[in-house]
Design a protein with these regions (language model features):
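Intrinsic disorder/low-complexity detector
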Residues: 8, 41, 172, 256, ...
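Intrinsically disordered, low-complexity peptide-like regions
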Residues: 31-33, 54, 252, 299, ...
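Aromatic/acidic, Gly/Pro-rich catalytic loop(s) in extracytoplasmic/lumenal soluble domains
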Residues: 1-31, 115-117
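Short, flexible coil/turn micro-motifs enriched in small/turn-prone residues
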Residues: 6-8, 38, 227
Length: 321
């Protein structure tokens, strides 16, 4: 096994401006989602991910049609020809990794290829296979490699599935400003939650807030059943990004306690208690009924024996003289 230290890790919780509670995520652009989230957390207005435009596009044996929901359908013009691809040419704005994402609701497998534009024009080398896109685990942001500022790259997407079709709303290519991201992480690491106690359903820690009105943004999923206190006072957690717990803070040092008891746990205790009480009542009822039955049976036996004695004839044994 190999273990790697992440120098940019922010831990279980970090101090944030309350604007994180107002962030609404887009369904179609994960790059801008990350920009919005990180800027809200850090109180910055930076472009950590920067979109680079497509400066040229070409298609071979491809026809298109527009769907009413904003998707474009790509399919072979002539199905007897095996090749069917779309090329996008982009120019790097900085030394960076290049990332690609094609938003869609209709996943159809495609193959992705990449090549330096000068090499493509020269024709001396074949395109490099970058991987498969869409379908299952392959439908995510794709890292196409690390390139340098000013470099032009050709990205080819080939329709490669039995349906002979592909759909996407847009073609997104982004670079990443790692240095700016790392510096922001270093600043945020100064005000993260220091966990002092941790159990399956309990967490305790401290965090310092420089400003009044700040919140603690956590990576803990929001769910009913949490009891949270800040400096001994019970508080109500908010939900951020439609999924994660956010806790209001006071200016200065904050001692946080979080205890989880799911709603069904209380219900199950009530049901269990009712069941136990019912069993006790049944036992007592059966116990008392058993004593009564013994008396009834004893009386019945006594009556039967008395009746038997009363009806049995008495034979007198006399001798004739």
């Amino acid at each position: 096994y190999k273990f790697y230290n992440n120098p940019n890790a922010l831990g279980l919780g970090m101090v944030s401006s309350p604007s994180i509670e107002d962030v609404t995520l887009s369904e179609d652009n994960p790059f801008e989602n990350q920009n919005m989230v990180f800027n809200a957390l850090a109180g910055t207005t930076k472009e950590y991910f920067t979109k680079i435009p497509v400066i040229n596009s070409e298609m071979e044996n491809v026809s298109t049609s527009q769907l009413t929901d904003g998707h474009t359908k790509y399919f072979p013009t002539d199905t007897s020809i095996a090749e069917c691809h779309i090329d996008y040419v982009v120019k790097m704005d900085k030394d960076s990794y290049l990332y690609m994402y094609l938003p869609t609701k209709y996943e159809r497998s495609c193959n992705v290829w990449i090549q330096d534009e000068d090499d493509y024009i020269d024709g001396s080398e074949p395109m490099e296979y970058a991987g498969q896109f869409f379908v299952g685990d392959n439908y995510s942001i794709m890292n196409l490699g690390k390139f340098y500022e000013g470099q032009e790259l050709r990205i080819r997407i080939t329709v490669a599935n039995d349906d002979n079709e592909a759909y996407w709303k847009d073609q997104l290519f982004y670079t990443f400003d790692y240095d700016s991201f790392a510096q922001t992480c270093a600043d945020m690491q100064k005000n993260v939650l220091e966990v002092t106690s941790f159990e399956d359903t309990y967490l305790e820690g401290t965090v310092n807030s420089e400003n009044d009105g700040s919140v603690l943004f956590t990576t803990i999923p929001y769910e009913n059943g949490w009891t949270i206190t800040v400096n001994g006072k019970k508080v109500t957690a908010e939900k951020s990004l439609d999924s994660l717990i956010t806790i209001p803070l006071e200016q200065g040092e904050n001692k946080i306690t979080m205890k989880f008891s799911p709603d069904y746990w209380k219900v199950s205790l009530i049901i269990t208690g009712f069941g136990v009480a019912l069993l006790v009542l049944i036992f007592l009822f059966e116990y008392k009924r058993g004593k009564v039955m013994k008396k009834v049976l004893a009386k019945a036996n006594f009556t039967a024996e008395s009746s038997e004695k009363a009806t049995t004839p008495v034979i007198n044994d006399t001798n004739d003289t």
